[in-house]
Amino acid sequence: MIARSLKHWTGRNLLAGSETGAPAAFAAKIFRAPFVLIAHGTQADPILNYGNAAALALWEMSWEELTRTPSRLTAEAPNREERARLLAAVTANGFIDDYSGIRISKTGRRFRIAQATVWNLLDERGNYSGQAALFSRWEFI
């Protein structure tokens, strides 16, 4: 769903040349990819439901911790209003591909992400199923 939705909104593949073949092999490549990929669901307070190895390392969480975390907690309280505006814009427009902002890890380590693509996730029927973000540029601050 993540790769298909990215292609739907942006016309780009998640991993060029890797989206054919066995789904398990594709999932393993994405999990080990050198970029951060993270997603949340559709709950009133959306819970993270996917993070690849780079996301787990950046947010300093285990899979179990990540998939119990409300996505709003990836930003510090003063930055949550700005984050909410971003997600509302993505909901309205389908995606953005130039997001920059400050995030915070589980241990309180702050980092700035740059040139992130954030997009709506759609199921096979085109129903809204959450949002995902992809970025490969960040710096600790």
Language-model features, listed with the residues they occupy:
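Terminal domain-start segments
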Residues: 1-27
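Sensory/regulatory domains in signal-transduction proteins
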Residues: 25, 31-141
